[in-house]
Amino acid sequence: MEQKISPQYVQTSLAASLTLGFQSGSFYRNAKLKGLNLLLHYEEGCSGRCHFCGLSKSRQVGPKGKTFIRVDWPLYPLEEIIERAKGKDQIHRVCISMITHPKALEDTLKIIQILRKETDLSVSVLISPTLIHHEESLVAMKKAGADRVGIAIDAGTLELFDQLRGKGVGGPHQWDHYWDVVQMAVKAFGRFYVGIHLIVGLGETEKEMAAAIQRGQNTGALTHLFSFFPEKGSPMEGQSLPPLNQYRRIQLARWIINENLGSAKQMKFDGNGRLIDFGMDINSLVQIGEPFMTSGCPGRDGKVACNRPYGNERPSGPIRNFPFMPEPEDIEEIRAQMKI
C-alpha cells in the first residue's frame, strides 16, 4: 500500500483546498486566495515541540486531528494540486512549508523543481532553519527555482523563543541559529527577498516586537506578521488572543519599518513597553489601509500573493489580517481599534 507522504503528497491549507475545488465552500466577503500554501507531510510528523504550534510533538491530538495556523490542512497528491492550479489565474505564487524532518530538505528541492517545470507560478519556501547548516542548501533552493524564502522565528525575544520553542520545551530550535540562517538566506537570495514570521501575543511587549521587526529590516528581511491563535490540544490552548489594539499598533509599526518610513528607534513606548508614539503623523498611513492587510511574499502584480484568507482569525471577525484592501468602513473600525 502506497504511503501518502512527501514529495508525492503534500498538505494544503483549507483556503487552497476550497480554491482548487477539492472541497466546496465560499469565502467571507468574497476574498480570493492568491497564493497556494503547501505543507510537507510525513508519518513521523515534525520533531519540533513548539508550545503554540499545531504540528508540535507535544500536542495532545492524533495526527489526523491536527490543525496548523488555526485551520485543517488536508492531504492531496502534488500532481493533482498542480493540475488544478493551472486553471486558476488568481493564483500567483506557491509556498512550500518545510517541517523539521530528516527528509524535508531533499524533498523540498524535488518539489521546487517539479513546480517550476510544470507551472509558471513563483515559488517560495518556508524553511526549517534547524535543518540548514550551510549556505549551499539555500543556494540549491534558488538554483532549483525558488525566488524567496521565509523563516518562522515566531517569538519576538530570545527568552520567549527558548521558553516556547527551544530548550525550555525540549525542542531542537535555537534562537541564534535562526538569525544566522536569516543572514545566510539574505546572502543567497538578496536583501528583502527573505521574510521572517513573527507572532504577536506570545508574551512579548510591543517594544520588543518592534525591535525584532527592526532587526529583520536591518538584516535585509521583511516581516510577515501573525496574531497568536490558540491551537486546540497544544500547551497554549488556554491562552487568549492578543488585544486587537496591540495587534493594530504592531501592524502599523511593521509597515513603517518595512517601508523604510521610520524606525523602531523613533517610536516611543510607555513603561510597560506599549507603543504610544510612532514618531510621525499616522493619519494618512491608517487611511490607505494597506498596513493592515496580510503581509507576505508578492505575486506577479507586486502585491501580496500569500494573503491567507482567514488563516489568522475566524471570518466572524474582527478581521486581523485583511486578505483584501480594507473598505472605508473597515478603516474607521481600525482607527477605533488602535486606541491612540
Segments (PLM) and residue ranges:
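Conserved strand-turn element in the central/C-terminal portion of the radical SAM core barrel
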Residues: 124, 128-131, 168, 181-207, ...
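Core AdoMet radical
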Residues: 57-105, 120-137, 141, 146-179, ...
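N-terminal pre-triad scaffold of radical SAM enzymes
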Residues: 16-59, 93-96, 148
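Catalytic cores of alpha/beta
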Residues: 133-144, 200-218
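Auxiliary Fe-S-binding modules of radical SAM enzymes
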Residues: 1-36, 188, 210-340
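Alpha-helix-loop-beta-strand connector modules within alpha/beta enzyme cores
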Residues: 106-125, 170-192, 241-266
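Generic structural signal for hydrophobic
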Residues: 85-88, 115, 141, 185, ...
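Conserved glycine-rich "GG(E/T)P / GGGxP" loop and the immediately following alpha-helix
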Residues: 92-114, 201-208
